[in-house]
A protein has these predicted regions:
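Long, contiguous, compositionally biased segments that the model treats as domain-scale units
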Residues: 2-164
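Interfaces and regulatory segments of ATP-dependent nucleotide/adenylate/phosphodiester-chemistry enzymes
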Residues: 175-177
Length: 177
């Protein structure tokens, strides 16, 4: 059975020569989008992604500092898991991504955290400081925020690797930043 993308599309370069993660199509790969690699990356795509992440961080932390609960709810709409990335701890179609209410509950402690750390302004810090918000949850959030960029990158990789026909299931951009 052809579980990995390279097998499915008959790309014979070998994983070490691919410019993308050769995910398993049937279950999640235990990898996560890393905000530090994005922030400090030197490529054009990393710089573009870093701008998106930074704009979201500003909005999120500002919504907590100003106690704008409706804005927080809007921002947490970006937290659910995108199953098509196949990153994280899921083991099938349904991953273990966050819901809006789950994020609100997990982030109840952030008010106190921000009072104690007024200069806090980085999403990765929240993985350490907010109970029930893990690297998997952060990766899901980043996948949503960066969805259009990731989709464009995927299309570029499809062309670069000569994959002739690809069925792309239409996906909602509702959670994209």
């Amino acid at each position: 059975m052809k579980n990995h993308l390279s097998e499915y599309f008959n790309i014979e370069k070998g994983h070490k020569n691919l410019d993308f993660v050769d995910i398993n199509r049937k279950k999640d790969t235990k990898l996560f989008l890393d905000p530090y690699l994005i922030k400090f990356g030197v490529s054009d795509i990393c710089k573009e992604m870093a701008e998106v992440v930074q704009s979201f961080e500003i909005e999120l932390f500002d919504s907590f500092r100003t106690k704008n609960f409706s804005r927080q709810k809007e921002l947490f709409a970006h937290s659910s898991e995108r199953n098509e990335t196949k990153f994280g701890y899921g083991n099938g179609r349904n991953g273990k991504g966050n819901s809006i209410s789950g994020m609100q509950k997990a982030f109840e402690s952030i008010k106190t955290i921000l009072e104690e750390n007024p200069n806090l302004n980085s999403l990765p810090d929240l993985v350490i400081l907010v109970k029930n918000f893990s690297k998997d949850g952060l990766s899901d959030l980043l996948a949503n925020l960066l969805y259009k960029i990731l989709l464009r990158y995927t299309k570029d990789q499809i062309e670069e690797n000569g994959v002739a026909e690809v069925f792309v299931k239409s996906s909602s951009f509702a959670n994209e930043w």
